[in-house]
């Protein structure tokens, strides 16, 4: 089926393709789409950069489509420094985790709002953790932050480990990688000012994402580490 005319889109990734074309991965409300951009060294090629909201028309019925029309739509989210690395991280998560051509309009909207917030200079960590959690939720990988795997309420004085396939499990013995109940309850309320909440959220999201990302390291994470 032909793709809708004039759908909003962002560039997630691009690379040279044949002599004068580019192979571009787009993120649209209808999902992650891959398409060939002909004459990529011309006017259209100047728009192939991340964080620019585009109006896009794709042609073709197969998985590899062709860019029929592409125009800038609105103001780009200009990201610099750590905000730029954060934006690249979001793009890499979407490239690695989103199935091709599966609609995720809620993720698209959250992504747009997150880019705007990054451009405004808002604190990075809450934005990244919120996006990671929304992505897990929309993909069906989320788990309860207020109840454990036995449907018992998370206890503020309890210790928990994450079982990625089931959720949070209370444990009695200290071991690496545990989470305090009081931190989990803060995360359930998105209370980023609570002591230890941001660090716990970072550890929790890293554990939750790892099994879905696989063993291949994230390039954006390495860039952030070496900045």
From Swiss-Prot:
Keywords: DNA damage, DNA recombination, DNA repair
SUPFAM superfamilies per record: ArfGap/RecO-like zinc finger, Nucleic acid-binding proteins
InterPro entries, A to Z: ARFGAP/RecO, DNA_rep/recomb_RecO_N, NA-bd_OB-fold, RecO, RecO_C
GO cellular component: bacterial nucleoid
Pfam families: RecO_C (PF02565), RecO_N (PF11967)
GO biological process per UniProt: DNA recombination; double-strand break repair
Source taxon at top rank: Bacteria
NCBIfam families tied to this protein: reco
Function field: Involved in DNA repair and RecF pathway recombination.
Similarity field: Belongs to the RecO family.
Record protein name field: DNA repair protein RecO
Organism: Pseudomonas putida (strain ATCC 700007 / DSM 6899 / JCM 31910 / BCRC 17059 / LMG 24140 / F1)
Encoding gene, per UniProt annotation: recO
